[in-house]
From Swiss-Prot:
Substrate binds at residues 104, 141. It comes from Shewanella oneidensis (strain ATCC 700550 / JCM 31522 / CIP 106686 / LMG 19005 / NCIMB 14063 / MR-1). Coiled coil: none annotated. Homotrimer. GO terms for biological process: diaminopimelate biosynthetic process; lysine biosynthetic process; lysine biosynthetic process via diaminopimelate. One of its GO terms (molecular function) is nucleotidyltransferase activity. This is 2,3,4,5-tetrahydropyridine-2,6-dicarboxylate N-succinyltransferase. The lineage of its organism: Bacteria, Pseudomonadati, Pseudomonadota, Gammaproteobacteria, Alteromonadales. Keywords: Acyltransferase, Amino-acid biosynthesis, Cytoplasm, Diaminopimelate biosynthesis, Lysine biosynthesis, Repeat, Transferase.
Length: 274
């Protein structure tokens, strides 16, 4: 694996000289191998090790190289044809394979090859970009999008119209991460490498990027780029120092543990008690 990483790194440094017609066959093979392993979930752009998320930048480089290496090609779809460099993940699936992997894909859902979809997932008409990792038992609801290299945990619910930001460039940027057992409410956007930690509930219409203030009303703490585990978050505002205006913020209204979540429905958790 180290040799593969080094070859990808070297090819990326020389990427300006690479085209579909000039690429070395070893480089083409290496990049395709990485895409295939991402597709199977054998590799992932980010993984949690000893409680901390680690980003494998060389895998992002392989994904970027794929755009320089592969030509556009006609892709058959249910209602139309497409013309793109990246094939569709399920193009060669048959009934037996769908059943074996326990994946339900509703018509017009689009998943690009190089993204991993875990068992017992449901994909409503939605979009999953390459490099993404969607773990077991997750629901990606209608018009939700999972961006490039985003990491979605087990038993997550991405509600209708949710946007999970992608990241390929700049290379140093970490992917957006939604940890296990989270609920992301309709039309919310989580972007720019924000991490939503395990068991959190994000209400409808909440927008969180790296510069968004995430205010804990119980403690007065302000977080950036991270929603602490077990948070229930709604959209709100915080006053300016001068008191003349207010600016948008995400507000942590309460914390819940797994035991509470198992007994109380999502709608109950989102009811604010003043």
């Amino acid at each position: 694996m180290e040799a593969l990483r080094q070859r990808i790194e070297a090819a990326f440094e020389a990427r300006t000289d690479i085209t579909p017609s000039t690429v070395d066959e070893r480089v083409r093979s290496d990049v395709q191998h990485v895409i295939n392993m991402l597709d199977k979930g054998e590799l992932r752009v980010a993984e949690k090790i000893d409680g901390l998320w680690h980003v494998h930048q060389w895998l992002k480089k392989a994904v970027l190289l794929s755009f320089r290496i592969f030509d556009n090609a006609v892709i058959d779809g249910a209602e139309t044809k497409y013309f793109d460099k990246v094939p569709l993940k399920f193009a060669e699936y048959d009934e037996a394979r769908f059943k074996a992997e326990a994946i339900r894909v509703v018509p017009s859902a689009t998943v690009r090859k190089g993204s991993f979809i875990g068992k017992n997932t449901v994909l409503m008409p939605s979009y999953v970009n390459l490099g993404a990792y969607v773990d077991e038992g997750t629901m990606v609801d209608t018009w939700a999008t999972v961006g490039s290299c985003a990491q979605i945990g087990k038993n997550v619910h991405l509600s209708g119209g949710v946007g999970i930001g992608g990241v390929l460039e700049p290379l140093q940027a970490g992917p957006t991460i939604i940890e296990d057992n989270c609920f992301i409410g309709a039309r919310s956007e989580i972007v720019e490498g924000v991490v939503v930690e395990e068991g959190s509930v994000i209400s409808m219409g909440v927008y969180i990027g790296q510069s968004t203030r995430i205010y804990d009303r119980e403690t007065g703490e302000v977080h950036y780029g991270r929603v602490p585990a077990g948070s229930v978050v709604v959209s709100g505002n915080l006053p300016s120092a001068c008191g003349k205006y207010s600016l948008y913020a995400a507000i942590i209204v309460k914390k819940v543990d797994a035991k509470t979540r198992s007994k109380v429905g999502i709608n109950e958790l989102l009811r604010i008690v003043d």
